[in-house]
Regions:
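Hydrophobic transmembrane alpha-helices and their immediate loop junctions
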Residues: 1-225
Length: 225
């Protein structure tokens, strides 16, 4: 069944879905299980995040240490690239408008209106958040910075993940430790993206299950077919 009916008035369907989510959350009494429910948001906090990360760290401590050090360098490189891209893009807007790359926030029902785009977004956002926030958390644990809570939040059609470090611990930590924690999230996302891209490029099986809009990014149809 085609999902193109969502393309028109997508924001209405998103709002309806949000109301349904709130009703289900209330019926399941999720407030008793770490959730905070408001008309515009659904937030989950867990105080046991660090204990789970500590168990992971016992098996991967050496690798995480290397990753944490790489994150410091990668963080500065990505920050430099972001400034370069921003300045170049602003310059293009005035000097070469055809080269200007429009940027927008991805919001289901607002900037994402097709059914396929919303579906891909909803499938990918949990992975991105888990990788990103998990990296922050495990490096903070490595640096012996206490994590008070970890969790996620949904603001109608916008999503967020978080690990909440103890502010005193974070402020008292060495500068290099703070840089490792800060750089870990974005670095983890970049590494994951490259690893996934490599997997797609080297395993033809994925061509069978990859969505059509993404297929052309990784594969070319052979001539004569």
């Amino acid at each position: 069944m085609e999902l193109d009916f969502l393309t028109q008035n997508a924001i209405i369907y998103v709002l309806i879905a949000w109301v349904v989510i709130l009703i289900i959350a209330k019926l399941l009494k999720l407030e008793n299980h770490g959730f905070q429910i408001k008309a515009y948001s659904l937030t989950y906090k867990n105080t046991q995040v660090q204990s789970a990360l500590s168990k992971m760290l016992t098996r991967t401590k050496r690798g995480i240490r290397v990753f944490a050090d790489v994150s410091v360098v990668a963080g500065f490189l990505m920050m430099g690239f972001a400034f370069w891209f921003l300045l170049t893009n602003i310059s293009n807007f005035f000097v070469e408008p055809t080269e200007f790359a429009e940027l927008t926030v991805l919001i289901p029902g607002v900037t994402l209106t097709s059914a396929s785009a919303i579906l891909y977004f909803l499938l990918s956002i949990p992975i991105v958040l888990i990788v990103h926030e998990g990296a922050h958390g495990i490096v903070a644990t490595l640096e012996k910075i206490k994590i008070k809570t970890g969790g996620f939040a949904i603001f109608i059609a916008m999503f967020a993940g978080f690990v909440e470090p103890d502010e005193d611990d974070f402020d008292k930590a060495k500068k290099i430790s703070r840089l490792r924690v800060i750089g870990a999230g974005a670095t983890a996302n970049v590494i994951f993206a490259f690893a996934l891209g490599l997997l797609l490029l080297t395993n033809p099986f994925f061509a069978l299950i990859l969505p059509e809009p993404m297929l052309g990014w990784f594969y070319e149809a052979p001539d004569g077919v």
